[in-house]
């Protein structure tokens, strides 16, 4: 049965409300409860993670924590919660993705941009239709990609020789300043720890590549899990509405990842 609470309007509203002190914290907690009741695990864990981060933010804002040591302790608590949530969120989303994987859409030839309009070309289409034109701004980027999730396989000769499942979450849509999340695990990390999770959260900017397709890159990012700090950087090509090709560098090895919409 379709959810009567989690609509597109609610999701768009939440992307704004979650950043409001106290209000966003309370609503994230309530949203996590509702998602749990509906067994909507992706929304549940997203809301739990947002609630914990918002709670730390509110403590700093309202309690007036100014001492460096106090702030460091609070952020350490938040990171320890986040690392565990990464593992749980990863497993739940992997199970769901295996159930609802959708077929891949063919990629037509890129089309030339209209220089009189601020447009980019996205190559996704249905049979017999022309390539989609998408505005380089919020409206169309939100409409086409709001709440989209993509998944694929990340391979590294040392840390994931057989390949590991990786997810890309686009909760707000694709536009300048939108937030996206990459989440995966390594078969083993540099110290031999097995099944080591990693997550990169950040804001993006869009640009047009030499191939006349839409690309996006991080303007700001934060890593958690194996490599905290900024973590891995990603550069992504929107090859179609159902395919994003991501590239990153780990150590001295360049990786290319095909991510399909799920």
Curated annotation (Swiss-Prot):
Domain of life from the UniProt record: Eukaryota
Signals that turn on the gene: Expression is co-regulated with the other genes from the iso-A82775C biosynthesis cluster and probably controlled by the cluster-specific transcription factors iacI and iacK.
Application in biotechnology: Iso-A82775C is a precursor for the biosynthesis of the anticancer natural products chloropestolides A to E via a Diesls-Alder reaction with maldoxin. In the absence of the prenyltransferase iacE, siccayne accumulates instead of iso-A82775C and can also be condensed with maldoxin to produce chloropestolides H to K, which show also antibacterial and anticancer properties.
Phenotype on disruption: Does not affect the production of iso-A82775C.
Protein name as annotated: Iso-A82775C biosynthesis cluster protein B
Function: Part of the gene cluster that mediates the biosynthesis of iso-A82775C, a enylepoxycyclohexane and biosynthetic precursor of the chloropestolide anticancer natural products. Within the cluster, the prenyltransferase iacE prenylates siccayne to generate pestalodiol E, using dimethylallyl diphosphate (DMAPP) as cosubstrate. The probable oxidoreductase iacF is then involved in the epoxidation of pestalodiol F to pestalodiol F, which is further converted to pestalofone A by the short-chain dehydrogenase/reductase iacG.
Organism: Pestalotiopsis fici (strain W106-1 / CGMCC3.15140)
